[in-house]
């Protein structure tokens, strides 16, 4: 590892610790030339699949886009940033576990809707309205009915 102070390539690892989450290693290093210490972090670099858009074009997977879509759907809802981060992590784990080199935007949308359905019903309907390109109020009503599931005979929905 190259020293950030003098540029020398000879450094020594003084201490290594695994993060609480277990996904990062923090290393304290000492430069053998200038004797200054610095910290580096090491983590696994996972290769996310490429995204195939509806028009057939391909782009790199972008976590920021997923997070922005979720944040927009959940705007002014009682959902914490940690909850959004957990949803993003679960979706990314699912994509990685699939082992596919490519994933369609439709598949990502389905995963987002499944997570939002469990997390926040209003966020689900907001996301669905954009994702499914709702054009009238009937489509909103259909999405709400679908989300609520089948109605039992004699039972009224609240």
From Swiss-Prot:
Protein name: Transcriptional repressor NrdR
Designated gene of the protein: nrdR
Record InterPro entries: ATP-cone_dom, NrdR-like_N, RNR_NrdR-like
Residue intervals of every unnamed zinc finger in the record: 3-34
Family according to the record: Belongs to the NrdR family.
PANTHER family (alphabetical): TRANSCRIPTIONAL REPRESSOR NRDR
Molecular-function annotations in GO: ATP binding; DNA binding; zinc ion binding
Disulfide bonds: none
Domain of life according to the entry: Bacteria
Free-text remark on how the cofactor is bound: Binds 1 zinc ion.
Cofactor list: Zn(2+)
Organism, scientific name: Bordetella petrii (strain ATCC BAA-461 / DSM 12804 / CCUG 43448)
Domain ATP-cone: residue ranges: 49-139
Region forming the signal peptide: none
